[in-house]
């Protein structure tokens, strides 16, 4: 820098200010500025590199992905695209939230315009339209849920599932890409039994008790179940008056682990997909589960965590199930076991009510939007 400044002043003294001299002077100044700027930029990059934290050899998400299929739990198409999961799941609550985002207003408009004023039909079309957009991003399955208000009608659940599959087919998405989500009531499990025989694969959700999981595998012979973790933890935190559980002692983690080991011990082919997580500790404690459906926020958290110290937890050697013999399940046994499980009874009912409430809210939004000129 000093060399170029001296050169400039020497030149000014020795030569007159003719046009050609000005050009020469400008060139010298430009070169000095360029070199100085480049030096500053290099220094900034060097400092930035020094401050940048060392990258992990593996993140927690890397470790998890080696042993478990990752599924995105959201209705936000953009969030799914950012996460690049294998599969994606939706439910009425997630669709309700996504439908209020401005970037999906066109999907809402299309669902309304193609339903000829039928709000119920528009609801189904909207769920399918979200599913179609998601299917363009994920290479695997998309789960679309049946109206929770049909949870106690086998016949109506079957009819609705067939309608949803037909809507997907009209848009060129085959049933091999879709899982129909159904609440794991007795009626829902019997509906899944019928649908599975027709080649319509089912994801039985809101599973909180072993009796639900056993019935899904032995009677419904369903493709996949979604046993919940976080909501079970919520119940026992409130009941026991504690703030938190260590991951290995989390009642939700223990429940899913028990279901997983029961299936593996007795040879059931139904896929276990843990759901409803409250923290990353719950997730990593279930590393090795067939699948885990995880919210975008927790996926980001796992991606930022050092994977050192985490390892596969489920599926190590012979399954450890100490609950006795295989359960001979029928309707009477199912209803009695569910009745005796306070947590499962309460959470199943609350889950159905919650999904139904969000369906009503979404119907209201569509009705109001339809009324606008």
Describe each region flagged by the PLM.
Residues 19-42, 49:
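N-terminal chloroplast transit peptides
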Residues 51-75:
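N- or domain-start disorder-to-order transition segments that initiate the globular core
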Residues 68-73, 86-90, 140-146, 178-182, ...:
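Hydrophobic faces of well-ordered beta-strands that scaffold small-molecule active sites
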Residues 91, 144, 180, 216, ...:
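Conserved, mostly hydrophobic/aromatic
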Residues 94-97, 101-186:
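Active-site beta->alpha loop and helix N-cap motifs at the rims of alpha/beta catalytic domains
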Residues 153-157, 182-196, 211-215:
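Active-site-adjacent beta->alpha loops and helix N-cap segments on the catalytic face
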Residues 208-315:
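Catalytic alpha/beta core domains of metabolic enzymes, predominantly
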Residues 313-373:
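C-terminal extensions of enzymes
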